[in-house]
């Protein structure tokens, strides 16, 4: 099934590229044309549908679904929950993003092992990730809503400030930080334009469209994956899955993106 899904997604990418040929010659943003065409038949929707099925499936040692998972608005209430994350959860006494909250519920409600979950959290060409699919489904339930990440709890504020510090801090063997690539307009790596995350409009366009389908990966990815890869590209120490660092950076970026209308899954290169 995963190979078939990957093949279908790749075929859709090729169709979109072919359909965009004439438009590319006239556009200043050829990759944007492709993304727009893909969004009409988004391969990422396959992950959303899988996530919906997995969410309601009786799974794990406890043979339970995730219908009692509380994403901040009450057990089982998904509409608008993603728009307010990361946020503080009293039961864990932590600020959590959607993925870390999903893992908490999979452990507590379904009896899964946290370490084992992390081993298969990121999908491959041969295997779709349940976590990535679940994150896409939960996020999709906030589509059309504005991001409204809170800072009302002290730990929410502390996490936000930690994320802000990390975003602007340069370190490691290359003296890189998030700000190195995402602090100015008109930067790019090969074919990839780099958004200026100090520009509110550009930042909102980014944070409101993750999780996203990546054509180069033939897979759907989450912000946890994106930040992990950023750290790898900066030659910094590997970030463990659901690291406090990734949650902190996500908290900073999502709060800065408040007011952006969510539309997931996005489509990226």
Language-model region placement:
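Bacterial N-terminal signal peptides that target proteins for export
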Residues: 1-9
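Short alpha-helical "patches" and their helix-cap loops
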Residues: 5, 152-153, 265-269
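C-terminal segment of classical bacterial N-terminal signal peptides
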Residues: 14-23
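Electron-transfer interface patches adjacent to heme c in soluble/periplasmic c-type cytochromes
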Residues: 25-46, 57-71, 75-133, 143-144, ...
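Short, charged low-complexity linear segments at domain edges
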Residues: 36-53, 145-164
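Internal, well-ordered alpha-helical scaffold/interface segments
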Residues: 132, 136, 157, 161-165, ...
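Hydrophobic, well-structured mid-protein blocks that either form specific transmembrane helices
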Residues: 134-141, 150-151
